[in-house]
Structures are given as C-alpha cells and as structure tokens.
Amino acid sequence: MPNRQAASAPVLARGQGVVYRELPCRSLLNRSTSRRMPFTWTINPYRGCEFGCRYCYARYTHEFMGLEDPHLFETEIFAKTNASDALARDLARLKDPGSGIAMGTATDPYQPAERKALVTRGILELLARSEDARGIRFSITTKSDLVTRDLDVLREIGHRMRLSVNITITTLNRRLSRILEPRAPRPGRRLLAVKALAEAGIRTGVFIMPVLPGITDRPASLEAIASAASRAGASTIAHQVLFLMSSAKRSFYPFLSERFPRLLAGYRRTYALSAYNTAAYRKRIDLLMESLRKRYDLDGRSDPDRAPGRRPDLQMSLAFRE
C-alpha cells in the first residue's frame, strides 16, 4: 500500500495521538523467510503497534506502505478487519502447515486497538472451529494481559491445535519498563497473565526478548524474571540478545542518546558492521540463561511441543507484504 493509499485508508477510530485505520487483506498467512525459525507461517492481525517499544525491530514494515517515519509505526495503526475470512481461505488451500503458525511476530496482537477492533479474537474464533486448522502447531506472542480475555476460545483451540502462548517480559523494573515499553502493560500484569494462562491448562512461556546490553542484562535481573516466571507457572523461558538492524537504529540510537547516553558509543561500535552482538557476548548470555532454565525447571522437558532456549534470528522472519 503506497503512502497515498495508506493516508486514505478508512479511519476506524482516533485516540490520543493515534489513528486507527482499516486495512483489508487478501491473505493473512505469511511464510517465514528463515528456515531456522520454529514456525513456517506468521499471522499479524495489525500493521503497526501502539506499545511503542523503543527497541522494536518491526518499524520498517510501515515502509512497505510508504510510511518512512519510524514514529508512524506506533501512531498509524492498521487493523486487518477481514482477517478471519482471509485466514479461512488460506487454511482451506494450505497443503503443508510445516512447523506451524506464529501470531504476533511483527505487531502485538493484543495492543490497545484489539479491545474494540476484535481482529485477534475473530482469528481465534475461526481457528477454534476450523477443521483445516486441526492438529497444527499455533503460538501467540504478546506483552499484554488482554490475552486473558480470550481464555474461553484459547481453551477450545488447545483441544484442536498444539497451542502455546508466550508472554514477553524484558524487565521486572516498573520504571525501566515504562522507559523501554512506554505503552505496554506493566510487568506485574504480564506475570498475572502467565499465571491465568497456566492455570487454564494452556502451555505458557516467557520470552526475554530482547536482552539489552548494559540495560537489562544483569544476571540478577535475568534471574528475577526466571524466578517470577517459574512461580507464575510458565513451562519455559526463551531469550534473544538485541538484534539491531539499520532500520531500527534510526529510532533506537536517538533514544539511547537521550536516556542512556553513556551506552551509545558502545552500541555504535558493537553494531557497526553487523546486526548481531559479538559471539562472545551472546555465548555468555546463552550460558547464563541455560543455567537459569535448569535452576527453575523452565526447560520444557515435559512439553514436547516447546523449543526452549535461544530463539535464533527471530526478527529475520518478519519480512512480509500482505
């Protein structure tokens, strides 16, 4: 959708500095571009995300619509209002589900728009009744406790599909969370969502993604998340060190300059030639997280459908143009 069409898309509602628009889609399933991913297909009910996470890697997806300013990713939200119909068509002709479907890879399916738009709810209701979806692995990733609104339909899906729900928690520090993820629910509310999902019998994991060097990577901080996740009933934790593409630097570096100026030079050096942190740093975090998984029984050994640990190149699966 070029810029002119994006600007003329029907307005569904307006919020404080946010415009919600309608975006019909011909297809909802998008094939992952990376063979290393633990899923083959992705679903993103929205384009853009109001949570405004400072490290967000998906801002570049608005560029496909001619919206070049990274800030527009959190202020121009497009709802795929015919998503369930599009998904029904996709599933009917899906010959190979591969390693399954992941929802929420380039937007949060439970961002504020979902309270009224109900796009995610419609998708879940379709999956709960679709014979074409039976037996497929399906995962949801979110930072929002709004997911508990849909416990009824998630239970139904759990009887038909291999369902897991992952709650992303990057820090338990409320103040730091407000700085990094200004409009996302606080960490305590996310932990309550983990507890509610687990008590409902839904396989539930916690994603520590991304681990931010010098900001959220203290061993005590990571252990606090692991301990809290275990107490809440999570079966796994997974992590990923910040993967910083050039497009994300446009908004992330100014943020660092304002809030963490002493770290900016180090980030520039580390990510100058690659979107990855150094192998030595990633190995150190991997070893720490592996020890925490064992210590808090979060390795998913009793759950064959889960793949705990480091999630390789998650951001690389996000190229989509539907």
Predicted regions mapped to residue ranges:
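Auxiliary Fe-S-binding modules of radical SAM enzymes
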Residues: 1-24, 28-31, 217-322
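Conserved Radical SAM active-site core
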Residues: 3, 7, 11-46, 51-166, ...
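Short histidine/acidic/glycine/proline-rich micro-motifs that form metal-
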Residues: 108-110, 211-214, 275-276
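Non-membrane alpha-helical structural segments and their capping/turn regions in soluble enzymes
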Residues: 117, 121, 184-191, 219, ...
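Conserved strand-turn element in the central/C-terminal portion of the radical SAM core barrel
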Residues: 140, 172-176, 181-183, 196-218, ...
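Active-site glycine- and acidic-residue-rich loops that bind
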Residues: 145-148, 212-223
